[in-house]
Amino acid sequence: MSASFAGKKLLVVGGTSGMGFETARLVLKNGGSVVLVGNRRDKAEQARQALAADSQISIIVADLMKEEGMKHVVDTINAEHKDISLLVNAAGVFFPKPFTEHDTSDYDMYMSINRATFFITRDVVRNMVDAGIKGSIVNIGSMWAQQAIGATPSSAYSMAKAGLHALTKNLAIELGGKGIRVNAISPAVVHTPIYESFIPKDDVEDVMNSFGSFHPIGRVGTPVDIAETVAFLLSDKTDWVTGAIWDIDGGVMAGRNA
């Protein structure tokens, strides 16, 4: 354990499982405090207990697909957490579907997450700028924002994540002079609970294993694989890194084995 995040408060939007949860664990382990945003109270409480550091953890429960949920997060941040200096935007949904089968509710689902991400980030940044707080933001993007995969048709998801990549670069330019770094990571297939939304839970392990050869490194990613890189980008060790979109993908974007 080190104290590399001592005195720093991290907000993780989508922090009750997967990549966001593991990032929170690393920041807590290294001296920081954490605010987790999740859409289910039972899951948020389970995450708090699993992290076993109640005095350093706050939770905000909100449905980010609804405007009132987004507003609740923003209001809570402004009332109780104006000292946030680190932000990870990890909220997301993933439902592969052919383009011609999409309806407006699918589109709205993805865009609602982007809307919440945009305006929560806006208020965190406002507070940081007003208080002269320097810090770091990391957005969880996606390989699907950079290339299409025939086995998982993801036009709506890809459009949403491509927007997040673009937001990353724009904010890096706007906020660099204020001491706020903004980066994104672009993972390939990572074994997280998100796949249980469209694959029977008992089948997920086999499906993940079937994707191993898709990655030149020979396996799918884990939430810890991603969290280690996210925590690195949050830390002072990457003080000269901003506007970057890092491929954390087991080599997928480098090319193909065959």
Q: What residue ranges belong to the model's regions?
A:
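Substrate-binding pocket helix/loop in short-chain dehydrogenase/reductase
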Residues: 98-99, 105-109, 207, 211
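Short, flexible catalytic-loop segment of classical short-chain dehydrogenase/reductase
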Residues: 187-197, 254
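Conserved glycine-rich cofactor-binding loop
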Residues: 16-18
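Residue(s) in the substrate-gating loop at a strand-loop-helix junction
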Residues: 142
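Alpha-helical segment proximal to the catalytic Tyr-Lys
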Residues: 126, 173-177, 239
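Active-site helix of classical SDR
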Residues: 113, 121, 160, 168
